Amino acid sequence: MDESELDALERELPALARMRRFAHALERIPWFANLGEPLTPGARAAARKYTDGLGFPDADVAVLVDWEDAAAAAEHNDWNSAAWEAEELLRADLTGRALETLSEDALHIAMTLIADRVAEPAREQMEQASFIWDVEDEAQQQLAVGAAVQAAHQASLVLVAAIDPSFSADDHPFREKFRLFEFGRWPVGIVGSTFNLF
């Protein structure tokens, strides 16, 4: 290993350590534990910070109270909407920032670790929620689990970007979106002027 390879590895270690700690914490999240319940003040604040940070300060937070409404909102989400485009721009920016710190291989390995650590506990807890809500459609269950994996990926990109002291992770929309999962919710998405939250 030459000097430049050692330098590159040294630059990657702090970000990889953050990703590892984050990955271990994912197993303790109460995935989908509060679906359909009234919002706590913390969850309401996270929802507001998410919509504000994404550029939709006028979006109303709509708490979906049953699985059918959540599934319908998820299935009819406009993937070319202004909210989707705003998230994609943020994701692209964060990925670029991450690649300033990590090699493509290191980022890929870290993201694979995150996905592995989210998918199983989220799937298990979605099975419990599905039993409670009497949901048999596996495709609908997978929508929620996929959203959890995506939110964890987005939050991990924020963690890597925060290695740069000039980047503020406080109140970043992806951080707030992930916090909603930490509150046991499923942020289904913004459609028109409504943020659907189950």
Residue ranges and their predicted role:
Residues M1-F198:
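Short, glycine-biased loop/turn motifs at secondary-structure junctions and
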